[in-house]
Structures are given as structure tokens and as C-alpha cells.
């Protein structure tokens, strides 16, 4: 590898680079069009118009029936919390939550807290490929279910869940259905108006938008109790002065994603496959997750009997950014809860490394990464074999 080349970023499921055109769209709203959208003067009117346009753009990406079904938030975590807590507060006579064992910590940490308060949570298992036990999900729904919350796509393996089918069964049971679509947004077509999904969470920074802003899709007619109280912003559904630059950035990011989604999905999928094939040629490694139904940008590769942390560290020193899983659990010494739920053996689980691409990833970067991984893994295995020989001689 050339010592002068630019760093290679393959951790796009953690966050993405804000698109330069998104930044340019945001800039005037810091210093020129800086009004409060609730103010009754020209500055406020400019801000209000910008928010309406962003709402329209995001509604278009989601395929929602009405622009006002979009509620802007500080991000996916807030949206997840708002959806689940609202369902428990508004679904009279229903006090149970159904979710899965592989959800993001923004959902699982909340359900653990709710369980400590006496709220019954039914956790549905997945199989060795990370696919949901569909029959167990259907059986878990009942007259006391307030909400079922299932992610659209897993952030660690990319496995896609059949959320539209799950939403239909949930509605038949009289409960609300929520999906955490933070990883899916901008990568798959959602078309919410053709579904029975009641609520959906998303975050701007996963689709080349700014950090600190997201949204909750709230289907028209769905009862909702705000998580944050105060002013009447967002039709009384989320109090607080709107983050106008962030909302504008999210709107622009949504426009770009809608324009490029299908061609980029195909291109990125081909690059992901090339990356996988190049790495798998080294042997003693395997792709984790559902390889037939996953996000085009994501691959989680386990290097048998090696430490993924050591591989990621060496790649970082070589200027290549990857991760072991969710950045939100970075620093934790516990193995991935997703891989544990999939019952991946310890000798394989500890060698897992996630590679996640974006529309900015190039063919040259993928080939460079394959060479770097191959070199690092070859050296680590040679060192391991030498150590074994020394110990047995």
C-alpha cells in the first residue's frame, strides 16, 4: 500500500461523511436565514418554509402518504424511545412489548428499563443467519400487546427483516408496529403508504446527512403522546425550537438518497461482493448473517480463531477504518449481542469484523482493503502457528 494514499473509510454503518452539497445547503441557516420557525416575521417565515420543504423531501424518500406524518427529532434514539413509550401510554389495556434479540441498544436498553418497571417484554429469537423466528413472533402477539418493534435491517450483519408482513400481523392483533429503519433509510425503498407500519425511526447521519437530527414517521391517525413536552412545535408532537440547519440538511440528504438509491444499491452491492470474495479467498473465514437478504453495503466477516479487535487495530494503523459492530457499544468488552443471539461460536464470534460501504466507496478502495486484510490475516495466522509450534516443541 502507498504510504501517501488517503485513508479508506469502511465503517459507514456507524456514520457517513456529510455530503458536501448537504453542508452547502445548511450553511445559510446558521448565519443568514437564522430565524426561529415559530416566529411571526420574515426570518421566521424563511425558516418555516425550509422546514416544510425538508419534510416534503423526507416524506418522498419514505413514500409516506402525507408530509405531516414526519416528526423531526434529535436522532434515531429519541425516535425509538418516543415510539415505544407513546404506544405504552396510549394503547389502553395493553402493556406488553414485543421485540427481537438483535435490536439496536436504543431499543433493547429501553425495554430492559421497562421490564424493571414491570412492563412485560417478549424477546423473539433469531436463527444462525440472524433471521427472525416468524412463528414465535406471531405467537407472541396477543390482546395485551401494545407495540411490536422490529428493526428494518440489522446494523451489524445487514440482515433485512420482513417488516411489512410483521406489521400486518401486528395490526391484526390490534397493536401498533414500529420499525427502527436507521440502517435501512436510503439503502432500500420503503414505500410506507403501501404498508401498515405505524411508526418508523431514522437518523440523518446514516445517509450522508448531519449528526444530531432524525425523524419519527407517525402514520396519520396513530395516537401519540410526546416524549418531550413544552412548546407546540411539530404539531405538538415534539417540543423545542427546531434545529433548522439540521432539518434542512436531512431534507437535502433525503433528496440525494432518493435520486441515487437504485443505481447506488446495485453498484455498492457489486463492490461488497468483490470485497467479500477477495477476503474469503484467504480461507478460514465466513460471512455472518443472511447472505440472500441483506443490505447491499454490509458484510460481517468472521476470521476463525483470530481476534477481530486485533485485525481492526492493524487495519486502522494501515489507514483503513472498519468496526467490530455497533459504534454505540464501542469500548464494551462484551461480545456482540447480535452474534450471541445468532449463537455464533466464541472462536468465530471473537474474529468478526464489519465492513460497511457507501456511495463514496470506490473500486480502488475495495481492492486496497482486500490486499490489506489478506496481508494482515496471513501474518497473524503465521504468527499464531509459530507460537503453537514453540509451545509444542
Swiss-Prot record:
It holds the Pfam family Aminotran_5. Its cofactor is pyridoxal 5'-phosphate. Keywords: Iron, Iron-sulfur, Metal-binding, Nitrogen fixation, Pyridoxal phosphate, Transferase. Its EC number is 2.8.1.7. [2Fe-2S] cluster binds at residue 328. Disulfide bonds: none annotated. Pyridoxal 5'-phosphate binds at residues 76-77, 155, 183, 203-205, 241. GO terms for molecular function: cysteine desulfurase activity; iron-sulfur cluster binding; metal ion binding; pyridoxal phosphate binding. The keyword Cell inner membrane does not apply. It catalyses: (sulfur carrier)-H + L-cysteine = (sulfur carrier)-SH + L-alanine. One of its GO terms (biological process) is amino acid metabolic process. The keyword rRNA-binding does not apply. InterPro entries: Aminotrans_V_dom, Aminotrans_V_PyrdxlP_BS, Cys_deSase_NifS_bac/arc, Cysteine_dSase, PyrdxlP-dep_Trfase, PyrdxlP-dep_Trfase_major, PyrdxlP-dep_Trfase_small. The active site is at residue 328. The modification N6-(pyridoxal phosphate)lysine is found at residue 206. Homodimer. PANTHER family: CYSTEINE DESULFURASE (PTHR11601:SF34), CYSTEINE DESULFURYLASE FAMILY MEMBER (PTHR11601). Catalyzes the removal of elemental sulfur atoms from cysteine to produce alanine. Seems to participate in the biosynthesis of the nitrogenase metalloclusters by providing the inorganic sulfur required for the Fe-S core formation. Belongs to the class-V pyridoxal-phosphate-dependent aminotransferase family. NifS/IscS subfamily. This is Cysteine desulfurase. The gene is nifS.
